[in-house]
Amino acid sequence: MSKRILYQEQARRALSQGMDILAEAVAVTLGPKGRNVVLEKKYSCPQIVNDGVTIAKEIDLANHMQNTGVCLIRQAASKTNEVAGDGTTTATVLAHAMIKQGLKYVASGANPMALKTGMSLATQWLVSQIRDLAQPISDHLAIKQVASLSAGNDDQVGEMISQAFEQVGADGVISLEEGKSSQTQLQITQGMRFEKGYISPYFATAGDTVVLDQPYILLTDKKITLVKQDLLPVLTLVSRTNRALLIIADDVEKEALATLILNKLRGIIQVVAVRAPGFGDRKKALLEDMAVLTGGQVITQEAGLSLETITLDLLGEARRIEVGKSYTTIVADSNKQQVKARCEQIKQQWARSDSSYEKQQLQERLAKLSSGVAVIQVGGATEAEMKDKKLRLDDAINATRAAIEEGIVAGGGSTLVHFIKPLIEWSHHLKPEEQLGAQIVAKALSAPLHRIATNAGQNGSLIVEQVQNQPNLGYDAANHRFVNMIEAGIIDPAKVTRCALQNATSIAAMVLTTECMIVDKPSGDK
C-alpha cells in the first residue's frame, strides 16, 4: 500500500487533531459531575460507560493521520491503567494539555529536544514532591473513602471494598462477577491467585482476560508435547460435558499449543493453557495445593498417572477462573475441610523448618491458600447498568490497592494545582529553553481541575485561580464548595497521580519531538 508522508508543523497538526477528538470524548467523564459515554456494540446492546480507558480503546478514526494521534494519546491512558489501574482520564487530560501548550512553543521556534528535557526534569521533581507529600493509609475509613470516590461517590461500594480488603488483606484477591440480582453483594470464598497468565494471547478472544465458568482443571508437572497421547484424551472427555477446561502444565509445546488454539477458535471447547508457577519442588508443592483446592489430582509419573489414561474424576473443578496476561485467579466453592487440613500441614512444615528461605516460601503458600478470594457479585437493574458498575468497581479496587501501596494525596486535581507555583520557582535554575519545557508541565497541571469544574457547570479558570490562591483548600465539585480535601475525604492515591503525570509527560514529549509522520494512504487516493 502506498504511503503519505507529512513533515514538521503539518505532521504535528494532524496528530493534534486526532488527540483533540479522543481527549474531548474521555474528558467529559472526569469528576463527580462527569457525564457518561454511550458505546455502540455490533452484536449486543449499547454500553454506557464512565471509564476513560474503555472509551479510548473504542475510538478508531477513518482519517489515518488523525487516528495516529488517537493511538498515541491512548497509550497514556493504557499505561496508567496497566500500572495504577485508575487515573486514565486524568492522564489523557494532562497529556492533551501538555501537547497543546507545547505545540505553541514549537511553532514559535523553541527547540523540541530542549523542551523534552525540561518536561522530563520537571516531572521528576514533581514525582519526588508527590512521594514526600503522600500520607500512608491503613484504617477502614480512609480505604472506604478512596474506594467510594473512585466508584463515583458510592458509599455502599466503598464500604464493601473496604470489607473485602480487611478479609483478604492488601495483597489478597478480589474478583468481580456479574450477579444474578439487582443488588451488589460481597462473598468470601475459597480461592487462589498465582502470577502466571495464558501461554498464548490467542486464548483471549475478547479483551485481555479470559473467564471460565464451572471449568474442569487439568494439573500436571509434565511438558505437554504429543497431541495424540497427551491432549486428545482430556479434550475428548471434557468436550462431551460441554464445560470449559483450564490446563496448568510445566509447558505446552508448539504443536500441542496450536491444537488447543484451533479447538478454542473453532468453538469445539473453551480451553486455556497456563504454565505452572514456581520451579522444582516448589512447583510440585503449588500444584498439590491447587489440587487440594479444586478437588483434583496432579498427573505425575511418580503417582503412576498418565495423560493417556486420564479420567474425569482426576480433574479439578472450580466455580470460576479468570486468566489474564500475567495472572490466574481460581475461585472454588467446595473442599473447605481439605483446604483447612492442607493449611495445617503447611504450618507444621513451617514450624519444623530451619531455613529462613524455606519458611518464606511456606508462608507465601499458606497466604495464597488460606486468605481465600473476595468475590463481589455486581448487580444492576439492566445489563448496561451492571457493566458500567463493574467497570467502576474495577477502578475502585485498583485505586484502593494503589492507595495502600503508596499513600494518598488531596484529590480533585488540587494537589497538581498547588504545585504550579513551586514548580515555576524550582525551574529558574534550568537553561532558558528547558524552562519552557517545565512551563509546559506547569500550565498543564491545572487541566484536570479545570475540567472537573467545567463538567460541574462552573467556570474552570475561576475555580483554578481560587484553589491556587488557597494552599490548604481544594474544590469539592459534588457540593460546589472549597474545603480541606483530605479532611473532607476527597483523596486520590499518590500512585495514580504519579503514574498519570509520568505517562502524560512521556507521550507529550514524544509528540513534540515528532518531525515526520508516515501513514497509509486511504484507498481511492492517488
From Swiss-Prot:
It comes from the Eukaryota. One of its GO terms (molecular function) is unfolded protein binding. Its EC number is 5.6.1.7. Keywords: ATP-binding, Chaperone, Chloroplast, Isomerase, Nucleotide-binding, Plastid. The keyword Coiled coil does not apply. PROSITE patterns: CHAPERONINS_CPN60. It is found in: Plastid, Chloroplast. The keyword Nucleotide-binding applies. It holds the Pfam family Cpn60_TCP1. One of its GO terms (cellular component) is chloroplast. Its main location: plastid. ATP binds at residues 29-32, 86-90, 412, 476-478, 492. Forms a cylinder of 14 subunits composed of two heptameric rings stacked back-to-back. Interacts with the co-chaperonin GroES. Together with its co-chaperonin GroES, plays an essential role in assisting protein folding. The GroEL-GroES system forms a nano-cage that allows encapsulation of the non-native substrate proteins and provides a physical environment optimized to promote and accelerate protein folding. Belongs to the chaperonin (HSP60) family. NCBIfam families: GroEL (TIGR02348), PRK00013.1 (NF000592), PRK12849.1 (NF009487), PRK12850.1 (NF009488), PRK12851.1 (NF009489). This is Chaperonin GroEL, chloroplastic. It comes from Cyanidioschyzon merolae (strain NIES-3377 / 10D).
